[in-house]
Amino acid sequence: MVALGAVVLALDLPGGQLRWWYLAAIILSLAGDVFLMLPESAMDPELSFVAGLGSFLVAHALYVVGMVLLGVSGGWLVIGTVAAVLVIVTVGRRVIAGARATDRRLFAPVMAYVVVIAVMIATSFGTGIIVGIVGALLFGFSDSVIGWTRFLRDFPHS
């Protein structure tokens, strides 16, 4: 994440604000990684999970702001919205239900996170920028595997 932050600082990004939205998102993603890696002796595991989830949720919302600043095309946004709805219908709803069954207090944070990931996927398509689309889809896939493993059952080799 530190290397990604350095890349964002080094790139010649359009518009003056874009760099700072993305840098803030990367810093929050780093914080999310740290929260999720904390040993049980350092912090309660459920609190650590919610703090990590919250950090990533805000980071993804900042990525969405950055993508909107880049510009979003209606046609591509429709395609992205269809992709995002498919993610919610196929995986998201089951992960949300699993979170509720595991601990009712996790229902709202996990649901909010699934929605933000879906919005990020849709918005990435809206930019029409392939690297952004691939990045958002990889985030969505990775987080789907994590959610599935945590709340439903183990994924082989995950």
Positions of predicted regions on the chain:
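Polytopic alpha-helical membrane-helix bundles and their juxtamembrane interface segments
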Residues: 1-158
